Amino acid sequence: MTIEEVSGETPPSTPPSSSTPSPSSSTTNAAPLGSSVIPIVNKLQDIFAQLGSQSTIALPQVVVVGSQSSGKSSVLEALVGRDFLPRGNDICTRRPLVLQLLQTKSRANGGSDDEWGEFRHLPETRFYDFSEIRREIEAETNRLVGENKGVADTQIRLKISSPNVLNITLVDLPGITKVPVGDQPSDIEARIRTMILSYIKQDTCLILAVTPANTDLANSDALQIASIVDPDGHRTIGVITKLDIMDKGTDARKLLLGNVVPLRLGYVGVVNRCQEDILLNRTVKEALLAEEKFFRSHPVYHGLADRLGVPQLAKKLNQILVQHIKVLLPDLKSRISNALVATAKEHQSYGELTESRAGQGALLLNFLSKYCEAYSSLLEGKSEEMSTSELSGGARIHYIFQSIFVKSLEEVDPCEDLTDDDIRTAIQNATGPRSALFVPDVPFEVLVRRQISRLLDPSLQCARFIFEELIKISHRCMMNELQRFPVLRKRMDEVIGDFLREGLEPSEAMIGDIIDMEMDYINTSHPNFIGGTKAVEAAMHQVKSSRIPHPVARPKDTVEPDRTSSSTSQVKSRSFLGRQANGIVTDQGVVSADAEKAQPAANASDTRWGIPSIFRGGDTRAVTKDSLLNKPFSEAVEDMSHNLSMIYLKEPPAVLRPTETHSEQEAVEIQITKLLLRSYYDIVRKNIEDSVPKAIMHFLVNHTKRELHNVFIKKLYRENLFEEMLQEPDEIAVKRKRTQETLHVLQQAYRTLDELPLEADSVSAGMSKHQELLTSSKYSTSSSYSASPSTTRRSRRAGDQHQNGYGF
């Protein structure tokens, strides 16, 4: 059976016969399966080949893999029907060969010019002599990798047009070798495996795994490397070669049925030309006849007709590839469309070269205007490139105001750093040498001003945070576009940095003025201020609730003093102590009011209030005026009396502090002061939380939005700076050229896909057929490899397979 029989019908005048059709049977004009789909993909491959390794679009293709001398080249030549590949005992395929088989119509004269080959590196040359094609492959390989068995991953692209082939595209890769020869590196096996994996790892790739029948299939290099990327065997087709040289008594039936290593797409067995056939110049067509004769003479292979022979392999590859392409077409078109949009956008960012001054001025003005618009859009949250994964632009400014600045101020307790002794000291210092009947205003104002001044640093820090955010926003604007002009980018960064610093100064000055205004006028008439009466009531309540009374045990022989006398004594004592430096004492000690209560009432009535009363001792007696006037005694008595009247004071220390113990009245005064501080601090804090963001927005943020464009025009729009600022680095010119080429290729590819006829657009049908292929049981048909009428009809009706699925 020949390829011609598979691809078309015999003339109607030829009746069905049980004899084998002759190899010269002509093809009909019926379009073979995938007559338009595969050529379109071939055209896409040629288009994307212009980009070389830069292409990121993976196209559907069939990749041939196998170990060295496994028969890959023989299979490819059998599919073409001509000798055209380099041959030898050593490695022959040293560069990937992309082989596009294109079926053409047979000419009436049947001349030798019906078949020809074209290399992509020689687009204007047609090779009608296939031996010349072999020599060109060898020459092109040697031009790149030398003549001493080196390998490379640069493709050789060959298109063969012939009426005797089916539309198939295959990629022949170097065979897997174990031992380096010639100038091959020591890691030649790893390099070849890496090259193979780079092709077959794509889901768009079908794998044609070639394994000789005289080796163990479980140890097949081709199947092993295919299983790495296709472990389930969904896109791997097995080819068993050299069936004619298996040991006597053995056959490949179990292998072909998939009983050893199952593959979803099945196996095909073929017979290769031996070295003797090549030496005797036997043609491929003669080898196909010999292959057919071999399978006829082996009854073990009867019933496996659809799994035997090169013609069946060609038909199977054609059908699987067509349906594979149809399944992938929607995604392929989508990927090309997305790549086209992305490349067009990138190319647009590089712009066009402008050499005239007028053009340069217009270009610069356009850049400055777009930059200011992008800057404002980021601040206002209207940018199209706004991130969805994090806060950016103006949202970060709002976060700094509310979640950092305001929250930090609200967490501050104005009395946190003030102890009760600090407040008591401030109160006593404010009274001077006098005793205060009420809590004085001065200590409250001093303490509240001190707390207000603490708000200056966080307010200035907030302004600095906003300044840094504005700098970050300026760096994010038009990042890709300004990569084209690094000098302009640098100048713009300098201008906007200086401009923002100029806006930061009045912002900080205004913040300082706001704090100064709050400190200069303490408005105790504010409606939200707690006020004196409420503060006293709250303080009394807090003091009473915090103190638990403890009864004092009195001695049994102590006479309870008169309540009126005791009360009067307490008032006098308090008044006196108030007059004595407001209760500030040194280490001499203080006589408390309780000590006065312990004195008898008679002594209290006879004793005068004065300095001696502070230092009451156990043996000390009061010296009256009459005793001083009585002088009947001797001089010694007078000296003793004089000495008794002398009171020596210790000098006060350098640092004076209030006493550690304080009265209930002092506790109330401290609580009142704290309440007043907290109440007024809350008022000022709210004012600062409102005024500081307003000052920053006015003097820094909004001022930048309003005036940035004018500043750019003033600083940068100068004719003598045009050429310097619009100078491009060399890499930009290279990128512009590369993206322009890529854009042209993608546009060609997109137009090529639009040329697909209705056959290629039947995606749903193609997908269903592809699923049918994966689950088909037709691989196990019982028809024999013979010239039975049923087999002949199936061969002749290959053109109907387009409508009836795969029909293997």
UniProtKB/Swiss-Prot annotation:
<dbReference type="InterPro" id="IPR001401">
    <property type="entry name" value="Dynamin_GTPase"/>
</dbReference>
<dbReference type="Pfam" id="PF00350">
    <property type="entry name" value="Dynamin_N"/>
</dbReference>
<dbReference type="InterPro" id="IPR030381">
    <property type="entry name" value="G_DYNAMIN_dom"/>
</dbReference>
<feature type="compositionally biased region" description="Low complexity">
    <location>
        <begin position="775"/>
        <end position="792"/>
    </location>
</feature>
<feature type="domain" description="GED">
    <location>
        <begin position="670"/>
        <end position="761"/>
    </location>
</feature>
<dbReference type="GO" id="GO:0005525">
    <property type="term" value="F:GTP binding"/>
</dbReference>
<feature type="region of interest" description="G5 motif">
    <location>
        <begin position="271"/>
        <end position="274"/>
    </location>
</feature>
<feature type="region of interest" description="G1 motif">
    <location>
        <begin position="66"/>
        <end position="73"/>
    </location>
</feature>
<feature type="compositionally biased region" description="Low complexity">
    <location>
        <begin position="564"/>
        <end position="575"/>
    </location>
</feature>
<keyword id="KW-0505">Motor protein</keyword>
<dbReference type="GO" id="GO:0003924">
    <property type="term" value="F:GTPase activity"/>
</dbReference>
<feature type="compositionally biased region" description="Basic and acidic residues">
    <location>
        <begin position="554"/>
        <end position="563"/>
    </location>
</feature>
<keyword id="KW-0378">Hydrolase</keyword>
<protein>
    <recommendedName>
        <fullName>Dynamin-related protein 3A</fullName>
    </recommendedName>
</protein>
<comment type="subunit">
    <text>Homooligomer. Interacts with ARC5 on peroxisomes and ELM1 on mitochondria.</text>
</comment>
<feature type="compositionally biased region" description="Low complexity">
    <location>
        <begin position="16"/>
        <end position="28"/>
    </location>
</feature>
<feature type="region of interest" description="Disordered">
    <location>
        <begin position="548"/>
        <end position="578"/>
    </location>
</feature>
<dbReference type="InterPro" id="IPR000375">
    <property type="entry name" value="Dynamin_stalk"/>
</dbReference>
<feature type="binding site">
    <location>
        <begin position="172"/>
        <end position="176"/>
    </location>
    <ligand>
        <name>GTP</name>
    </ligand>
</feature>
<keyword id="KW-0962">Peroxisome biogenesis</keyword>
<dbReference type="GO" id="GO:0042802">
    <property type="term" value="F:identical protein binding"/>
</dbReference>
<comment type="similarity">
    <text>Belongs to the TRAFAC class dynamin-like GTPase superfamily. Dynamin/Fzo/YdjA family.</text>
</comment>
<dbReference type="Pfam" id="PF01031">
    <property type="entry name" value="Dynamin_M"/>
</dbReference>
<feature type="binding site">
    <location>
        <begin position="241"/>
        <end position="244"/>
    </location>
    <ligand>
        <name>GTP</name>
    </ligand>
</feature>
<keyword id="KW-0547">Nucleotide-binding</keyword>
<feature type="binding site">
    <location>
        <begin position="66"/>
        <end position="73"/>
    </location>
    <ligand>
        <name>GTP</name>
    </ligand>
</feature>
<dbReference type="InterPro" id="IPR019762">
    <property type="entry name" value="Dynamin_GTPase_CS"/>
</dbReference>
<keyword id="KW-0131">Cell cycle</keyword>
<dbReference type="Pfam" id="PF02212">
    <property type="entry name" value="GED"/>
</dbReference>
<keyword id="KW-0496">Mitochondrion</keyword>
<feature type="region of interest" description="Disordered">
    <location>
        <begin position="774"/>
        <end position="808"/>
    </location>
</feature>
<dbReference type="InterPro" id="IPR003130">
    <property type="entry name" value="GED"/>
</dbReference>
<feature type="region of interest" description="G4 motif">
    <location>
        <begin position="241"/>
        <end position="244"/>
    </location>
</feature>
<keyword id="KW-0342">GTP-binding</keyword>
<keyword id="KW-0132">Cell division</keyword>
<dbReference type="InterPro" id="IPR045063">
    <property type="entry name" value="Dynamin_N"/>
</dbReference>
<feature type="region of interest" description="G2 motif">
    <location>
        <begin position="92"/>
        <end position="94"/>
    </location>
</feature>
<dbReference type="InterPro" id="IPR022812">
    <property type="entry name" value="Dynamin"/>
</dbReference>
<dbReference type="GO" id="GO:0005777">
    <property type="term" value="C:peroxisome"/>
</dbReference>
<dbReference type="GO" id="GO:0005739">
    <property type="term" value="C:mitochondrion"/>
</dbReference>
<dbReference type="GO" id="GO:0051301">
    <property type="term" value="P:cell division"/>
</dbReference>
<feature type="domain" description="Dynamin-type G">
    <location>
        <begin position="56"/>
        <end position="330"/>
    </location>
</feature>
